[in-house]
Amino acid sequence: MAVFLVERSIPGMSHHDLLLAARALEESCRRLAPGRVRHLRTLQVLGGSRCLSLFEADSKDLVARANNAAQFLFSSVEEVEEVVSRGGDRTDLP
């Protein structure tokens, strides 16, 4: 499966509302296509009015459909590639 980054503008959205929206994303992924689209995490840009969500999915279309089903508006959906793993190691080194 590929990884996708969803960017959205969230002016005036509280932390609590963002938590509820992230839960709605998780639920819409489970209902829409179990095992084919999964919400990994949502990050809020501090001091700004944006958030970024990561998804693992079979297609960009599935990610867009999951976001639409959760009624969480977004600006873009792009496929991304990990450059540094969680442990801090580069993924392209032997």
Residue ranges and their predicted role:
Residues M1-R31, L40, G48-S49, K60, ...:
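Short S/T/G/P-rich N-terminal loop/turn motif that feeds into the first structured element of a domain
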Residues L32-P34, A69-F72:
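Short, well-ordered coil/turn elements that cap or connect secondary structure elements
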Residues R36-T42, S76:
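A short linear hydrophobic-aromatic micro-motif
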Residues L54-E56:
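Short hydrophobic/aromatic beta-strand micro-patches
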Residues F72-V84:
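Conserved short beta-strand edge segments in small beta-sheet-based binding/regulatory domains
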